[in-house]
Amino acid sequence: MKALSKLKAEEGIWMTDVPEPEVGHNDLLIKIRKTAICGTDVHIYNWDEWSQKTIPVPMVVGHEYVGEVVGIGQEVKGFKIGDRVSGEGHITCGHCRNCRGGRTHLCRNTVGVGVNRPGCFAEYLVIPAFNAFKIPDNISDDLASIFDPFGNAVHTALSFDLVGEDVLVSGAGPIGIMAAAVAKHVGARNVVITDVNEYRLSLARKMGVTRAVDVSKENLNDVMAELGMTEGFDVGLEMSGAPPAFRSMLDTMNHGGRIAMLGIPPSDMSIDWNKVIFKGLFIKGIYGREMFETWYKMAALIQSGLDLTPIITHHFGIDDFQKGFDAMRSGQSGKVILSWD
């Protein structure tokens, strides 16, 4: 079958021919319809320091997808041939304390699809049936293919009660923009998103944020004054991993503010911990999605009217995958969809 693989320990992704995966007793075989390119896939393409330490070569990559069930392991219940599914990209162990306690998103032995085991940039994917999620009929293939990153956004945004709150989102990548849209949809008062990429800030405006702020040109305190905010942000969603953005968030949070961090900062990021202590801030780390509460909320948010379609900016056939990666690497895109049909 055709598959996009990290074939060599250098920059790039290659179209390869690999054997079709075998279906285990508890697995589903999924025929891939559409996939989306994640920032993680760009890291793997660029072969940065993280990728060199993490990715075995060769490896079929990718973890954002929608497809159709075409094979079912003999122990699997609850699925049938023809079901349209996406799936949780974190394969969990099932036997650690968190897994056994129902907190599977906190599994200490997580294996990543397209990172530690073969991924979805292929004609077929095998995953445990436990990880599959049936897509409702009224949700399109395009939207279903981005459920994985949308789940990051939902998990982060819904970490705290947002009704009536003023929310700061730092980082206008696709996940940050979707988190801002979720915050607005569920009843936040002001949702302010910051970045230095004007293309992506304009995408955020299309998604309905209160203010999209280019912090290289505007002062966040001036924006707060313009919005009539006198006490700071109630909730911060840190999606950038950029130390200056996080420090600015700490500066502008209200006392007792709550911060959810999805962005991965450099390991040596320094902050003024006095601001955390004396403001009484609460900081929560976010990894992946809650299994599977986040997935049900994702479907419900879309079914209740949340419009994510502006975040999908590019479509390519799989033979034009290089154009898709070029678009993602340029920073002048939202989500990029690759079609396998």
Swiss-Prot record:
Cofactor details (free text): Binds 2 Zn(2+) ions per subunit.
Catalysed reaction, written as an equation: L-threonine + NAD(+) = (2S)-2-amino-3-oxobutanoate + NADH + H(+)
GO MF annotations, alphabetized: L-threonine 3-dehydrogenase activity; zinc ion binding
Residues annotated for Zn(2+) 1 binding in this entry: 38, 63-64
Subcellular localization(s) per the UniProt record: Cytoplasm
GO cellular component, one term: cytoplasm
EC number(s) given by UniProt: 1.1.1.103
Keywords: Cytoplasm, Metal-binding, NAD, Oxidoreductase, Zinc
Pathway it works in: Amino-acid degradation; L-threonine degradation via oxydo-reductase pathway; glycine from L-threonine: step 1/2
Example GO biological process: L-threonine catabolic process to glycine
Binding site for NAD(+): 175, 195, 200, 262-264, 286-287
Site residues (Important for catalytic activity for the proton relay mechanism but does not participate directly in the coordination of zinc atom), renumbered to this chain: 148
Disulfide bonds: none
Cofactors demanded by this protein: Zn(2+)
Location (main, coarse): cytoplasm
Domain of life according to the entry: Bacteria
Family as reported in the entry's similarity comment: Belongs to the zinc-containing alcohol dehydrogenase family.
Subunit field text: Homotetramer.
Function recorded in the entry: Catalyzes the NAD(+)-dependent oxidation of L-threonine to 2-amino-3-ketobutyrate.
NCBIfam families in the cross-refs: PRK05396.1, tdh
Record's protein name: L-threonine 3-dehydrogenase
